[in-house]
């Protein structure tokens, strides 16, 4: 029986089409150019390389260039989220109907995650925030992130369901025995890599209730 739901935040609890992640992604590139002196025409290549080898741009910059991770996170998330997000009453209603405990499991900082959930009007549904600081910068899909989260939850892996728009983030959850859901939303930035680890595939976050 599923007792706990782990929700990814970005491009999962709101759609990729909102445009919020585009601005954050631009700010990641801007940080590399203006703060680290990376040539503008090489940023995309370096970020793809970090994505493949380390999972995220932050993880790559942290390991290879020893950046101040907190300064980076502050810079890239200094975005007015209300510009992109509005209260989502169907999401609010669906979350209210689901009896399971709910947490956010995100590679973003909790301070930003709270602002996002507040803008969506759904903050009250979430009991815990497993954010990049909780993960000690070992972001998804690093297996240690999942071990940390599971150790903090009052649930076994087989009682957890995890939802993420980045399919490869589901692999470690699946290996631990969680039920996994890939949100294959329009505008998915990462393609289908890892989709074989998804027990279910949904097109919008509103389909979660149907699975449960
Ligand atoms: Mg996401």
Language model segments and positions:
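Asp-based, Mg2+/Mn2+-dependent phosphohydrolase catalytic module
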Residues: 1-3, 96, 103, 109-212
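A short, Lys/Arg-enriched amphipathic alpha-helix followed by its capping loop at the start of a domain
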Residues: 90-100
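Short helix-to-loop capping/linker segments positioned immediately adjacent to catalytic or ligand/cofactor-binding
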Residues: 83, 102-104
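N-terminal helical cap/lid subdomain that shapes the substrate entry/recognition surface
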Residues: 2-7, 12-92, 111
């Amino acid at each position: 029986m599923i007792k706990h739901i782990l929700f990814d935040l970005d491009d999962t609890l709101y759609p990729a089409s909102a445009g919020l992640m585009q601005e954050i992604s631009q700010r990641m590139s801007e940080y590399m150019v203006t703060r680290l002196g990376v040539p503008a025409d090489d940023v995309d290549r370096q970020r793809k390389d970090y994505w493949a080898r380390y999972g995220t741009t932050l993880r790559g910059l942290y390991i290879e260039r020893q950046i101040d991770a907190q300064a980076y996170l502050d810079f890239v998330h200094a975005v007015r989220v209300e510009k992109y997000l509005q209260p989502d009453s169907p999401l609010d209603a669906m979350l209210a109907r689901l009896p399971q405990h709910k947490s956010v499991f995100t590679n973003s900082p909790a301070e930003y995650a709270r602002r996002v959930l507040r803008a969506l009007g759904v903050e009250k549904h979430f009991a815990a925030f497993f954010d990049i600081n909780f993960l000690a910068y070992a972001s998804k899909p690093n297996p240690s992130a999942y071990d940390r989260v599971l150790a903090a939850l009052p649930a076994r892996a087989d009682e957890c369901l995890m939802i993420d728009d980045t399919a490869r983030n589901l692999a470690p959850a699946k290996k631990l025995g969680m039920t996994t859901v890939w949100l294959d939303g329009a505008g998915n930035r990462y393609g289908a890599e890892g989709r074989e680890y998804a027990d279910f595939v949904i097109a919008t976050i509103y389909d979660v209730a149907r699975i449960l």
